Amino acid sequence: MRLVVCLVFLASFALVCQGEAYRGGYTGPIPRPPPIGRPPFRPVCNACYRLSVSDARNCCIKFGSCCHLVKG
């Protein structure tokens, strides 16, 4: 009998906790913020065809966005 009461209590407690989570707006893990000092995206570095060779080299060195294009 005690086991049944304990299981019912735990089940009701779990349901209450789930309801509080949904009501509080919690839907999953909190996303990680972008690193400090770096922009979240680099549209200039992503447009490789518009960059000069020196700008492409700077993007490669600073941000790791390397443009491997043959300039003609």
Curated annotation (Swiss-Prot):
The modification Lysine amide is found at residue 71. Disulfide bonds join 45-59, 48-66, 60-67. Higher expression in hemocytes and to a lesser extent in heart, testis, gills, intestine, lymphoid organ and hepatopancreas. Traces in eyes and subcuticular epithelium. Not present in the brain. It is found in: Cytoplasmic granule. Residues 1-21 form the signal peptide. GO terms for cellular component: cytoplasm. Keywords: Amidation, Antibiotic, Antimicrobial, Chitin-binding, Disulfide bond, Fungicide, Signal. GO terms for molecular function: chitin binding. Antibacterial activity against M.luteus and E.coli bacteria. Antifungal activity against N.crassa and F.oxysporum. Presents chitin-binding activity. Belongs to the penaeidin family. This is Penaeidin-2a. The lineage of its organism: Eukaryota, Metazoa, Ecdysozoa, Arthropoda, Crustacea.
